[in-house]
Design a protein with these regions (language model features):
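An N-terminal structural lobe/cap that precedes and organizes the functional/catalytic core
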Residues: 11, 15-16, 21-132
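Glycine-rich, mobile lid/loop segments that gate access to catalytic sites or pores
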Residues: 136-244
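Proline-rich low-complexity regions
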Residues: 110, 129, 182-183, 249
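Conserved small/polar residues in nucleotide/adenosyl-binding loops
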Residues: 245-251
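Phosphate-binding glycine-rich loops and adjacent basic patches that engage nucleotide phosphates
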Residues: 53-65, 76-87, 111-116, 139-147, ...
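Beta-strand-enriched accessory nucleic-acid recognition/scaffold domains that flank the catalytic cores
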Residues: 2-23, 165-172
């Protein structure tokens, strides 16, 4: 088996690694002396307050008789319990990821017409530049999906004529485009990985304008593009708790 010289670990590297390790040790006592919060945790394991936000909150304790006790976790977006939002999508027969994205970005739940227009806007942004899939995603595909996403997002910079414009309208435009494109970048990257590294058949389905984010993921992921309404609803529900993390990734 031949070794790529670009990736070869030589004896010199082994020696230098040991030198680097020896000079990178810090006396644990110094953390206590200077009150350093390792891993943003107090010595008792409690998280350190480093900022304030009105966007989301996680409640994992309850006050009982003046003492904090562990409790089933509750996630809140802009003051709304995520469980209530999910229940509302079931009652009103709409998808929740787009609704939560609107809520997180603009601070309120959208009216039906606002949600329709917002979903339409995301759909219109769900188009990759010409030859992007062939030239960027399909060439030298990575085994690491997060690496694939990172490379794709960084490369989109080269296709953006206003990449360095930090005005609020332009940054919002970039955020909405990335939110719209993440199903394509992630699934196409996965298809390239499966084809080049696992020998699977390669297929690329274009997104459908009438589909939600969850529906498009299933549509472009499956060879026959088939999925059930229940599968789409379950995936949409799974996307809701990670929508804030996804939003933070674009900040």
């Amino acid at each position: 088996m031949t070794t790529n010289r670009f990736c070869e670990i030589t004896h010199e590297l082994q020696h230098l690694s040991k030198l680097s390790e020896q000079c990178a040790r810090i006396d644990p006592a110094l953390y206590a002396k200077y009150d350093v919060k390792r891993g943003l945790r107090d010595i008792n394991g409690k998280g350190v307050l480093v900022g304030l936000t009105e966007i989301s909150d996680v409640c994992s304790t309850k006050m009982i008789d003046g003492k904090l006790h562990p409790a089933d976790g509750e996630l809140y977006y802009r003051g709304y319990n995520v469980k209530d939002i999910i229940d509302g999508t079931s009652e009103n027969s709409h998808f929740g990821f787009e609704e939560c994205t609107y809520l997180l970005l603009f601070g309120k739940l959208p009216a039906r017409t606002e949600l329709t227009e917002f979903t339409k806007m995301l759909s219109e942004y769900r188009t990759l530049p010409t030859s992007f899939v062939r030239d960027i995603i399909m060439k030298a595909p990575s085994k690491d999906m997060m690496n694939t996403l990172a490379r794709s997002v960084l490369t989109l910079y080269s296709y953006d004529d206003l990449a360095d414009d930090i005005s609020l309208p332009n940054v919002l435009r970039q955020c909405l485009q990335l939110i719209s494109l993440f199903p394509l970048l992630s699934v196409y990257g996965y298809q390239a990985y499966k084809h080049y590294h696992d020998g699977a058949s390669l297929f690329i389905h274009p997104p459908k304008a009438e589909y939600s984010t969850a529906e498009n993921i299933l549509h472009i992921l499956r060879p026959d593009s088939q999925f059930t309404p229940l599968e789409a609803k379950l995936l949409d529900t799974a996307l809701i708790p990670v929508s804030y993390t996804h939003l933070r990734a674009h900040e």
